[in-house]
């Protein structure tokens, strides 16, 4: 398995093993019952499969805050059966207060940090001709070399045209016992 994280605004934060990230998004999909289809699409499609557009940054923040609140009422035991045996044994998510919000606090915090960096860099560097800066959206990405360097080269149009699993998940292989 390999590690993945969030990248945005020139900041990369490695968060977890790919199977844990996959479980994070599956739990969001399964337990975000109070979200509208449009709100769920911001996280369940834009963040999971594509990237967070600048115009969606604030709405994505609000949706994630709602999900985090919802996760604060759900036990970490909801992860049972969602992680391969190896990840259950070595699971860093088990050292929490017992809620999904605590288990995935690193995920929520990393997304927020990358959103903040993307917005700060855009404000600071845009309009300065010597930089020719463009918004660097938040994406889920492989965080180990050389995967990170390869994934970093994927164009936004490739993300926009993506059909099927996200790029960060396409390299997952099943382990044989």
Give, region by region, the residue ranges found by the protein language model.
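Acidic (Asp/Glu-rich) sequence patches and key acidic residues
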Residues: 1-177
């Amino acid at each position: 398995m390999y590690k993945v994280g969030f990248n945005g605004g020139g900041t990369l934060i490695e968060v977890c093993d790919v199977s844990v990230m996959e479980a994070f998004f599956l739990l969001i999909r399964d337990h975000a019952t109070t979200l509208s289809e449009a709100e769920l699409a911001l996280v369940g499609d834009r963040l999971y499969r594509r990237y967070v557009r600048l115009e969606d940054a604030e709405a994505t923040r609000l949706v994630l805050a709602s999900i985090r609140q919802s996760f604060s009422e759900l036990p970490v035991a909801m992860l049972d059966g969602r992680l391969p045996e190896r990840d259950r044994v070595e699971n860093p998510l088990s050292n929490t207060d017992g809620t999904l919000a605590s288990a995935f606090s690193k995920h929520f915090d990393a997304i927020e940090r990358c959103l903040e960096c993307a917005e700060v860099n855009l404000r600071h560097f845009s309009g300065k001709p010597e930089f020719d800066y463009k918004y660097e959206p938040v994406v889920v990405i492989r965080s180990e070399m050389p995967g990170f360097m390869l994934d970093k080269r994927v164009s936004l149009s490739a993300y926009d045209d993506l059909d099927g699993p996200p790029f960060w998940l396409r390299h997952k292989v099943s382990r044989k016992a």
